[in-house]
Amino acid sequence: MTEAAIPVLQVENLSIAYHDGQAEQRTVHEVSFSIAAGEVLALVGESGSGKTTTAQSIIGLLADNGRVQAGSIRINGTDVAGWSQRQLEALRGKVVSLIPQDPTTSLNPVRTVGDQVGEMLRLHGWRDKKQIAQRVLELLHKVGLSQPELRARQFPHELSGGMKQRVLIAIAIALQPALIIADEPTSALDVTVQRRILDLIDDLRREFGTAVLLVTHDLGVAADRANRLVVLQAGRIQEQGPTADVLRNPQSRYTRQLLADAPSLGTAPARAPRTVAAEPAIVVQGLVHDFAVAGQRGLFRAVDGISFEVPRGSTHAIVGESGSGKTTTIRDVVGFGKPTAGRITVEGVDVTSLRGEALRQFRKTVQLVYQNPFSSLDPRQSIYAIIEEPLLNFERLPPAERERRMHDML
């Protein structure tokens, strides 16, 4: 085999297990695939299929109780499956980069964006501060962030979800690695930003000849972006091949079911029913919300004079790209934000005037389904405790009745 024909990544008979405190449980079973330079391969499967575990093993980021039981992971022809963390650190960022699934938990909240992008350069030998600063601005510009000088000075909480994901991509491409592992890179983003992020990854792949391992549960994304598919179920490959072939003529029952369940592969959207005129449950009038911006005089206006009504029994969609003010508006409606001007009433209650116990009791009226489960759920609490908390806060129920409610909800 000539050097030119060596795949950037070649995984052979990979098996991975986790120790649960009593015994090892194998979660990935004899998985094999390869990716050539400039190629996109998608690992597809439902939650728990072993996609992320497989991807994490490539870059040596398995949890402490996980290990590669068998098989090989060759990067540019070198088997790294048995490498120490110290050896792998030399590869991370320079040869293989990871775009994590969740930008909120992946970025350090107390360090500026520019400092975090620059860290990748410093870890790999860059010493000149001016060169680092210049390269950071180049990277932020390359990933499509406006005002890169301002963004470099900002902290992650000052950016929208799409902006934060672009920062992670800037970190991943800083040293032009041979392989990028994109682990559900757009799952928490709106459709408009999702396409832009995927377009950006595709542009970078073409520019640098980078190989891309795309981890996704979305067959629509895989169909649109990947040269080849590997379909996983319970840690086992169900089938793999060129994307068009797998989608046109799936061989496994599981793949056929995934295709049938994929709304992004041609299913006609449901038509919303017409609503009979009803009293509004929510009324927003002239909503304005300004934010202070670090390192900049004046205020940034995120929401500017929005007004709308939501009738009882209806569904009202707020649509816009990342940074358009959707989330700020919703947080104001539920009483989490403090608007600069305007009036919000929910079931006749002026939300902007609520304080203390009145605001706490208002939480029973309006609840959020959050965008990002990783940063919304307390890792120190069990799932049972998290779901039980609203009942403890707002319902005085006997323990037996509360437990029955809990089991019904679960």
Q: What spans do the regions from the language model cover?
A:
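ABC transporter nucleotide-binding domains
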Residues: M1-L265, A272-L410
